[in-house]
């Protein structure tokens, strides 16, 4: 993994696997708390990406309804019903944060992630 500043990250090609990194002033790299994302096109100080794991909701209201239902079910039953997953939707970063950083994975690391996930498939 390598940590990139925003200027260098925007130069990377479409199809780059990354997680959002810490801001410059933060002390720790904690990739375990962030989800994997795929970077697509870069724009001036912005970019398009897709989270590998996201909730399928067609609006903010629907997302809030799903969240509320899942949390209520978990409080009552200890587990929620299925939460719909979205594997297709892309979004713009849209924060224009100059000091943002990104942790980027190389091909060997991506292969290792895939191999690790394949051990879970039954």
Task: Give residue spans per PLM region.
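Short, surface-exposed terminal/edge motifs of secreted or surface/virion proteins that either
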Residues: 24-47
């Amino acid at each position: 993994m390598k940590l990139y500043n925003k200027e260098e990250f925007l130069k990377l090609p479409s199809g780059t696997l990354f997680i959002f990194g810490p801001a410059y002033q933060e002390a720790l790299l904690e990739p375990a708390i962030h989800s994997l994302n795929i970077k697509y096109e870069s724009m001036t100080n912005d970019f398009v990406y897709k989270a590998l794991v996201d909730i399928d909701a067609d609006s903010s209201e629907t997302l809030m309804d799903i969240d509320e239902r899942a949390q209520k079910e978990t409080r009552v039953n200890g587990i929620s019903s299925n939460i719909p997953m979205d594997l297709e939707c892309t979004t713009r970063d849209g924060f224009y944060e100059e000091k943002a950083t990104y942790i980027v994975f190389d091909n060997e690391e991506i292969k290792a992630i895939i191999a690790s996930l394949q051990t879970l498939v039954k």
